[in-house]
């Protein structure tokens, strides 16, 4: 993978329109740059772990440009990526995202910098209510599946984990022959099971 490939991917991502119920954070150059810094860090070594979620959330990726990553994570995480890039990243506010805390917490506990992505890389919300989340439509997920296919083809992670049912369905559709793990999404009371399932998957990462 090359920096040119990263630039082309992010440029195409940023070209997608924002609508009254679907926000594209990557149209903001500051958030697109956060993602670029993250991807450029990941290409230095083979990616061992990818975790795929459902969609960008209003407390996380919609504010930072990074899946499962809130402004609080940008500010406080001790992960090697944030420790080395924090001063170069754009941060707005200090809000936290529970799912992001759990995902990065698992990664940090096992000493990995994961490739984080979403089945839908944009933020679906109620019309006119950007500070809400909603379940993505099938049509939206089909758009997201194009980018999902590209990102996994580019990084070729060793282990792929679907976080939640929507991610599991999209991965199965895009990569029908891919052997991947499926775990409970940590939201809505699923954090304990999520952490246990991830610990089992990542035993070899110690």
Question: Whereabouts are the PLM-identified features?
Answer:
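A polyanion-binding, active-site-adjacent surface
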Residues: 2-159, 167-169, 174, 178, ...
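Short, flexible loop segments at boundaries between secondary-structure elements
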Residues: 177-206
């Amino acid at each position: 993978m090359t920096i040119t490939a990263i630039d082309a991917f992010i440029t195409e991502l940023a070209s997608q329109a924002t609508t009254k119920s679907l926000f594209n954070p990557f149209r903001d150059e500051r958030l697109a740059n956060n993602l670029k810094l993250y991807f450029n860090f990941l290409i230095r070594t083979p990616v061992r772990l990818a975790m795929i979620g459902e969609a960008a959330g209003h407390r996380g990726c919609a504010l930072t440009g990074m899946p499962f990553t809130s402004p609080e994570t940008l500010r406080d995480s001790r992960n090697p990526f944030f420790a080395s890039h924090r001063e170069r990243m754009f941060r707005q506010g200090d809000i936290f995202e529970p799912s992001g805390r759990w995902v990065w917490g698992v990664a940090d506990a096992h000493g990995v910098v994961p490739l984080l992505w979403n089945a839908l890389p944009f933020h679906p919300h109620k019309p006119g209510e950007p500070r809400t989340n909603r379940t993505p439509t099938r049509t939206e997920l089909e758009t997201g599946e194009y980018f999902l296919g590209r990102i996994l083809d580019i990084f070729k992670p060793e282990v792929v984990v679907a976080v939640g049912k929507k991610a599991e369905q999209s991965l199965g559709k895009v990569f029908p022959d891919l052997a991947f793990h499926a775990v409970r999404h940590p939201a809505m009371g699923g954090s304990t099971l999520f952490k246990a399932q991830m610990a089992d998957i990542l035993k070899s990462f110690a």
